Swiss-Prot record:
Transmembrane segments: none annotated. One of its GO terms (cellular component) is extracellular region. Keywords: Antimicrobial, Disulfide bond, Fungicide, Knottin, Secreted. Disulfide bonds join 1-18, 8-22, 17-33. It is found in: Secreted. GO terms for biological process: defense response to fungus; killing of cells of another organism. Has antifungal activity against C.glabrata. The keyword Secreted applies. This is Antimicrobial peptide Alo-3. The presence of a 'disulfide through disulfide knot' structurally defines this protein as a knottin. Belongs to the AMP family. It comes from the Eukaryota.
Length: 36
């Protein structure tokens, strides 16, 4: 799984976050994993 702070996509195309949450703001190319 992807560690917190590393890049991710909410749709899971780059893998799943260890925390289970990918934070992505509108307009961002990619998000990052973090705790919810």
């Amino acid at each position: 799984c992807i560690k917190n702070g590393n890049g991710c996509q909410p749709n899971g195309s780059q893998g799943n976050c260890c925390s289970g949450y990918c934070h992505k703001q509108p307009g961002w190319v990619a998000g990052y994993c973090r705790r919810k």
